[in-house]
A protein has these predicted regions:
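Short beta-strand/loop motif that positions the catalytic acidic residue
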Residues: 381-383
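Alpha/beta-hydrolase fold active-site neighborhood
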Residues: 245-361
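Single conserved hydrophobic/aromatic residue that forms the stacking wall/gate
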Residues: 1-14
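A catalytic-pocket lid/entrance helix-loop region that shapes and gates access to the active site
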Residues: 189-247
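Alpha/beta-hydrolase fold nucleophile elbow
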Residues: 163-173
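Conserved alpha/beta-hydrolase
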Residues: 115-132
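Catalytic-loop region of hydrolases
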Residues: 31-120, 423, 430-438
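Alpha/beta-hydrolase active-site loop
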Residues: 142-161
């Protein structure tokens, strides 16, 4: 009887579940259709597809047709990939101003930090000239900060008809840079900006990073790093054949002789190990085997960074043109280097020959500095104390009511709200909650 009773209850529950499913299914389907119908009213939107997600009620990928040159739409157009995580029309919206490609945001498990913290809609915008947002043909003259800001303005304009609530722009690293420059060009598009680890470089080789690396961490940490660099340079004759074999196996090609590439990997090492917060204790002793030393060098600053067909070519073009970059201090290593100078390595190693005469334009950095000094928009900058990019951060901004700069003690390029101390985290969250409730 008990078994029969349990069985009957299960049958009743199953039937109820089926009825419930039938009742609920059309509602979610109509909600899905409703979103697609709403966004399709914008004729510049095409190719809308639903995506699997475990983090949003609904998620879509779509393309916005954008002018190559927003000042001269007659020059042609390209399709920009946009990924939308939909929560609700009454929720705040986070626009992620990605600095590179958007491939990783397609993952079902992906959700950006702020959209999760505030249960907000997410609009993730792939940067022009990366992955599926690359124009055909690829004419580099239209890859400018101003055009990228105009792209974001067009995306925001398209989606504000759906999401009339508060808007936050955010991005990480180059995406943080993009969020900053977007606010400069269109200060009223969003209510709040949260750039993470965003540099503001003043030159192709900015000059502030090398002194930073001479001060960061402890003296013992810096000595261990430099000792490792010197050791792999001293053993270059022994390590270079294996380095070359690995490059050959991976079909890497470079714009400079292999020994120079090896030298640049060693120069890059100190920047890279601090940038990503690698445990200094993981650095091998100078007495370690050849294989141990080379494996560690390749893991921290491998040669793929310098290859001819780099997936980051679009970024190097932007860095050389107006975003700026960093240089290397070669003085401690000069006796062991095959190069006499590292100056202008970005143009020589990273850019195609026909672009090497491109001059750096300071107009953008001057415009951003002027904007930050004269204005006080609601912005939160987040940096890591040990991240070399912080050398070019806006940590000099003082005495602002709305602009806040947080530096995570001991933090790296991975500094986020979630990695902060409880005290810092509470301050950031309190600011954001207050602004969203205004």
């Amino acid at each position: 009887i008990l078994i029969g009773l349990v069985g009957s209850e299960m049958c009743i529950r199953d039937r109820f579940s089926i009825v419930l499913l039938i009742a609920v299914a059309p509602v979610s389907l109509s909600a899905q259709e409703s979103f697609i119908q709403k966004i399709e009213k914008n004729k510049s939107v095409s190719g809308i597809k639903s995506l699997d997600t475990s983090r949003f009620p609904e998620k879509y990928v779509m393309y916005l047709t954008q002018p190559l040159d927003h000042r001269h739409p007659e020059k042609g157009s390209f399709r920009q990939r946009v990924i939308v995580g939909h929560v609700g029309y009454d929720r705040p919206t986070v626009i992620v101003t990605e600095g590179y490609g958007a491939g990783y945001a397609l993952r079902p498990t992906y959700r950006e930090e702020l959209s999760e913290l505030f249960d907000a809609n997410m609009i993730f915008v792939e940067h022009r000239y990366f992955l599926e947002s690359t124009p055909e043909p690829c004419d580099w003259q239209y890859l400018t900060a101003e055009n990228s800001a105009e792209d974001l303005h067009a995306v925001t304009t398209a989606f504000k008809t759906l999401y009339p609530g508060k808007w936050i722009s955010t991005g990480i690293s180059k995406g943080g840079q993009t969020s900053l420059l977007y606010r400069v060009f269109f200060p009223d598009d969003v209510d709040v900006s949260v750039p993470y680890v965003a540099p503001l470089c003043y030159a192709r080789e900015d000059g502030r990073h090398e002194p930073f690396l001479r001060r960061v961490g402890t003296e013992a940490d810096r000595k261990k790093i430099e000792d490792f660099q010197l050791e792999v340079l001293k053993r270059k004759a022994r390590l270079l054949p294996r380095f070359e074999k690995m490059c050959t196996e991976k079909n890497y090609t470079f714009r400079a002789p292999l020994e120079e590439i090896y030298d640049f990997c060693v120069l890059e090492y100190s920047f890279s190990i601090w940038q990503w917060g690698t445990d200094i204790r993981s650095i091998p002793e100078t007495s370690a085997s050849d294989d141990t030393l080379l494996d560690h060098l390749l893991a921290i600053s491998g040669p793929s960074y310098f290859i001819v067909d780099s997936p980051n070519l679009s970024f190097f073009v932007q860095a050389a043109r107006e975003l700026g970059y960093y240089g290397y201090d070669i003085v401690p290593f000069k006796p062991y280097l095959s190069i006499k100078t590292s100056k202008d390595y970005l143009r020589r190693l990273m850019l195609p020959e026909d672009m090497r005469k491109m001059k750096f334009d300071k107009t953008l950095s001057n415009k951003i500095v002027r904007f930050l000094k004269k204005n006080d928009p609601k912005m939160i900058f987040i940096y890591g104390q040990n991240d070399p990019w912080t050398a070019a951060g806006v940590t000099w901004l003082k005495n602002k009511k709305n602009i806040h700069v947080f530096v995570e003690p001991g933090g790296s390029h991975l500094a986020r709200i979630g990695t902060m101390s409880e005290d810092q985290k509470q301050k950031v969250m309190s600011l954001l909650r207050g602004w969203l409730e205004e």
